[in-house]
Amino acid sequence: MQDDILESEMSKAPQLQQESQEGQDKQTLSPPGHQEPPGIISELDNALPEENQLEKGTMENANGKETLRLESPVLSGFDYQETTGIGTLAQSSSSSSSSLTGFSSWSTAMPPNPSTLIEEVGFFNQAATTNNAPPPLLFQSFSHHTSTGFGGNFSHQIGPLSQHHPSPHPHFQHPHNQHRRSSASPHPPPFSHRSAAFNQLPHLGNNLSKPPSPWGSYQSPSSTPSSTSWSPGGGYGGWGSSQGREYRRGGVNPLNSISPLKKSFPNNQTQTQKYPRNNSGFNTKPWVEDTINRNESIFPFQERSRSFDGFSMHSLENSLIDIMRAEQDSLKGHSSLFPMEDERSYGEDERSDQSLSGLGSPHSFPHQNGERIERYSRKVFVGGLPPDIDEDEITASFRRFGHLFVDWPHKAESKSYFPPKGYAFLLFQDESSVQALIDACMEEDGKLYLCVSSPTIKDKPVQIRPWNLNDSDFVMDGSQPLDPRKTIFVGGVPRPLRAVELAMIMDRLYGGVCYAGIDTDPELKYPKGAGRVAFSNQQSYIAAISARFVQLQHGEIDKRVEVKPYVLDDQLCDECQGTRCGGKFAPFFCANVTCLQYYCEYCWAAIHSRAGREFHKPLVKEGGDRPRHISFRWN
């Protein structure tokens, strides 16, 4: 009996294969570029006889035995619901053909060519494949809604797929196949043993399980205070931490050395001033052109990894500006993605005749912990005044910006009522008055001007030169700790010179500069005419102090200044460590290259009585930066 059944099945096998081949030929008559309209697969399934339906559900090998059919890739959002119980082959094929109509949205990028759809996916049975298959296709643009079965309209583009991957027989299905998902699905699978495999995909497991972070993986370098660190204000403390002053971003101003907050853009306004604003843009230095847009990169250090070149201003400046930008953003609590108010264009609300405070100005100051962040010194230089203008007339010309006091060098001693050299200083009571003054100025060749009248001269343009607090400090190499034993004092620094420019000059001369700072008044935060430069190595430090004098050349600045070791007033004696002087701080420092140490009075006398050291001269700290009270009446 079994032999008869076997012979009948073998006789039917060629007929079934021939009918299946005819059905495939009908299905693939359309050219590869042709796309079938929806519903054509359902019509073909209904037109096929039951024997052909049987062929879709199973495949037979050469021995006539039933083998596992090729299952189609189970895609994201469609949980395959296996049929419970054992059904007939016809029932299995019927459920498979009807389930093919369950995909609601298929990627339109699928090639309609049937030859490209006969793919072997990683979870296919290798023994059931009949040809050499290329790498699997990934389909990622379908819906991610989970359903317990297949339903809806099936897209026309996977018609050829149904011819080669019919549904499996219930005998050979495993329980875990009920929830099989595509590896491209962003939803986690229902089982923990698949979650691990899903999370191993670097472009899926980590990114799709959570929203992308705009901050990336970058962490700004933290400044670690050490016993040898000191503050830019001249005190003793950590990196750039000083009393009454935040850490300065020593980045180069994107516009000019006078007004980094002003920006002019082309507009339709008619300029009636004597010195119109330069709408074509400011004449910036070549190595600061790409710092105008400070928020152009999310990751500050990833795109500028060039090596430092002490003589290449371009490569050095780009990297340094990024370092300072990131450190300043991390310390002030804001990100480069969200620029401060001074980054906005001046053309948004340009009013050259803005009066009084800067509340209505487009450059309104941001607030941090309820307090406004200061950007400028309250002391402003005014040059080119008319020779016959007196103090009252100067006050009247600038009183519209806020309460102020007019001062000039040796004013109290000279008893003069007129500025003797044609310049003066405006000391404003409120820092916002300085911003209002800047907004009212005209810009010409990178300088700010404001028209002032005297009894004999009408509307004479005078130069306005405010001091940006960010220009007080500049870190060239944040990876190096600040060592006061490798720091020099630079006296007679021109007041317009910024910290970044001082660092560039010293690094070009001696190399190894890691920090530069401009000494400022603790109350008004205006430059005092001195600076500090810290080196990262002893050789550069010794070379600088051995020179004694340095020629500072930058732009219009060309001045010879004195260089000395930077002396601290809180160091113990290097010889006795305070044992011979009762633990008092050492008052003397020997700047000779054979010593370079702090000494108490006893050790100085003992060491420098030796032959060859009797001519060494001690350096004494002239006094720290102590707040001073200015007694005058605001006008």
Swiss-Prot record:
Q: Which family does it belong to?
A: Belongs to the RRM CPEB family.
Q: Which GO terms describe its biological process?
A: cellular response to amino acid stimulus; cellular response to decreased oxygen levels; cellular response to glucose starvation; ionotropic glutamate receptor signaling pathway; negative regulation of cytoplasmic translation; negative regulation of neuron apoptotic process; response to ischemia
Q: Which GO terms describe its cellular component?
A: cytoplasm; dendrite; dendritic spine; endoplasmic reticulum; growth cone; neuron projection; nucleus; perinuclear region of cytoplasm
Q: Which SUPFAM superfamilies match?
A: RNA-binding domain, RBD
From the Swiss-Prot or TrEMBL record, state where the protein is found: Cytoplasm; Cell projection, Dendrite; Cell projection, Dendritic spine; Postsynaptic density
Which spans does this entry mark as compositional bias, Gly residues?
232-241
* Coiled coil (UniProt feature): none
Q: Which PROSITE patterns match?
A: RRM
User: What is the protein's name according to its record?
Assistant: Cytoplasmic polyadenylation element-binding protein 4
Its source organism is Danio rerio
